[in-house]
Amino acid sequence: MSLFNIFNISGSALETQSKKMDVHAKNLANSDSYIYKNGTLYPYVARIPMLQFDPISENNVGGVKMHTVAGDTSSLKSIYNPNSPIADSNGYSKVSNVDIMSETINAITASKNYQTNLEILNTTKNMIMKTLTIGQ
């Protein structure tokens, strides 16, 4: 593996972690939102970033990329709120399946992964610069 592959690998990780933070931020921002479709209000469904290995060479060395962003298949929550305009005949309303705690933790984890990969890039750059000064 070339030392320069580290730039490609960490670069792909930076891009992917940035996209993950974006997905989690959108989930948090829309946790109380509804989508109006065909005359009906539907609760926002949490999105889950799906990552995929992104090979650089045939040596199973590579980075990561965002494969897709899928809707969370866990069921929507029902809350009793008979005064809500979207309540059913029993007084229950469907609300988003966004788990605030999990989304916050996932956003922090993506942020830390981003910082770690940035540090890897800086360390690699410093190693290359030190190598260039050998023999001077």
From Swiss-Prot:
This protein's record includes keyword RNA-binding: no
Entry protein name: Flagellar basal-body rod protein FlgC
Protein family membership: Belongs to the flagella basal body rod proteins family.
InterPro entries in UniProt: Flg_bb/hook_C_dom, FlgC
Record key words, sorted: Bacterial flagellum
The organism of origin for this protein: Buchnera aphidicola subsp. Baizongia pistaciae (strain Bp)
CC terms in the record's Gene Ontology section: bacterial-type flagellum basal body, rod
GO biological process: bacterial-type flagellum-dependent swarming motility
Description of how the protein assembles with itself and partners: The basal body constitutes a major portion of the flagellar organelle and consists of four rings (L,P,S, and M) mounted on a central rod. The rod consists of about 26 subunits of FlgG in the distal portion, and FlgB, FlgC and FlgF are thought to build up the proximal portion of the rod with about 6 subunits each.
Main location: other
Subcellular compartments: Bacterial flagellum basal body
Pfam families xrefs: Flg_bbr_C
Record flagged with keyword Thylakoid: no
